[in-house]
Amino acid sequence: MQLILLQKVTNLGNLGDLVDVKPGYGRNFLVPQGKAVPATESNKAEFEAKRADYEAKAQAIHADADARKAKLEGASVTIAANASTEGKLYGSVGAREIADAFTAAGLELNKSEVILGEGAFRNIGEYDVLVHLHADVETTVKVVVEAEKA
């Protein structure tokens, strides 16, 4: 299935690229999310006519991601969780808890932007977490998981 990308998509292409993808990926993800349109002649002509608008929108999104990166750079948050005396958590601290903690601290962060390479944290300690704000914008934040005070 051939598509025209309306924004940069990680591991696929940039704005305006003509890409071949599997039909399910295009039909169920890229097109409904507004990231691409089918590569018909009319869509190609319409895209070329509106190319400047799409590029301006992409620049604005990238600038917003850069501004958020500047706020998050070097940020740290502490999460208290129920833990045993050995330091093992009775549950886990995942992307949702991390995003909620940063949002509560005044730094907006979505669950989908938090990348936990090795899965949720199951022990108390200090962790570096990758935050993927845009296809080109990533930063690292510090998360401290500590035992709840009884």
UniProtKB/Swiss-Prot annotation:
SUPFAM superfamilies, sorted: L9 N-domain-like (SSF55658), Ribosomal protein L9 C-domain (SSF55653)
Entry keyword set: Ribonucleoprotein, Ribosomal protein, RNA-binding, rRNA-binding
GO BP annotations listed: translation
Gene3D superfamilies: Ribosomal protein L9, C-terminal domain, Ribosomal protein L9, N-terminal domain
GO molecular function (one): rRNA binding
Source organism superkingdom: Bacteria
Keyword field contains Ribonucleoprotein: yes
GO cellular component: ribonucleoprotein complex; ribosome
InterPro entries (UniProt xref): Ribosomal_bL9 (IPR000244), Ribosomal_bL9/RNase_H1_N (IPR009027), Ribosomal_bL9_bac/chp (IPR020594), Ribosomal_bL9_C (IPR020069), Ribosomal_bL9_C_sf (IPR036791), Ribosomal_bL9_N (IPR020070), Ribosomal_bL9_N_sf (IPR036935)
Cross-referenced PANTHER family: 50S RIBOSOMAL PROTEIN L9
Family (UniProt): Belongs to the bacterial ribosomal protein bL9 family.
Role according to the record: Binds to the 23S rRNA.
Name this polypeptide is given: Large ribosomal subunit protein bL9
